Swiss-Prot record:
It is an enzyme of class 5 (isomerase). This is Diaminopimelate epimerase. It is found in: Cytoplasm. Catalyzes the stereoinversion of LL-2,6-diaminopimelate (L,L-DAP) to meso-diaminopimelate (meso-DAP), a precursor of L-lysine and an essential component of the bacterial peptidoglycan. The gene is dapF. It comes from Pseudoalteromonas atlantica (strain T6c / ATCC BAA-1087). PANTHER family: DIAMINOPIMELATE EPIMERASE (PTHR31689:SF0), DIAMINOPIMELATE EPIMERASE, CHLOROPLASTIC (PTHR31689). Pfam families: DAP_epimerase. The record marks H161, E210 as: Could be important to modulate the pK values of the two catalytic cysteine residues. The keyword Isomerase applies. Homodimer. One of its GO terms (molecular function) is diaminopimelate epimerase activity.
Amino acid sequence: MQVQFSKMHGLGNDFVVIDNVTQNVFFSKEKISQLADRNFGIGFDQLLVVEPPYDPEQDFHYRIFNSDGSEVSQCGNGARCFARFVKMKGLTNRNKIVVSTKAGRIVLYHERDGQITVNMGEPIFEPAKIPLKANKQENIYIIRENDHTFFCGAVSMGNPHCVLLVDDVETADVEGIGKTLVAHERFPEGANIGFMQILNSGHIKLRVYERGVGETLACGSGACAAVAVGQMQKKLNKEVTVDLPGGTLKIRWQGPGSILKMTGTAEHVFDGNITL
């Protein structure tokens, strides 16, 4: 069986995108892991699957699988690639696209300059909904592991995020601390670990260690999480430029009770076929 796919990326965070509207494909966890291998497969951070809508008021359903085959609820960079893919492949001609995800409903917008804006919904800070084991909601949590103490913010952007403030993202121990915290017992479902350096109140640098993936060149939901946490800690403005290793995103959030929006690029690399 031949399955068509597209290779895409958002700021270097790379994806294989599958049209499961005109095709009917199932990938096992093991098969996803094989295809994600950069030496023996196609190579990607995540597999994105476009499915028919579950609700007639929505345009599509959006599924995301990490390179280890685990299914996750949200991916901001992937959402931008999803939006470009469905229009590029003629699955829709709309500039506003409503999709459902495992985490809920999101809205995607094609901008006139070719960039894509994603309505990421409201950041969720309630510990039980992140989920995070904590007695009460705080702007800064103390997490201990062995002889180390970490001060971090926590938020869900449809997936759990832990954000640490660092002096310099270039010298931060992203690999070591990331591995320590990504599956910490305080996060029952694991968490993506963000390392944020504040340049000024409207500009940050960020690196993210993602659960099930490791460090990537960019993490859209991680950028959203960092800005939301920074605002709650009274350190950031309502509009923030986020520099990631793979490029730049613009994040806008008016504060608690309002939706957060992310704007950035989505690039098509090539199309191919998988033999199953």
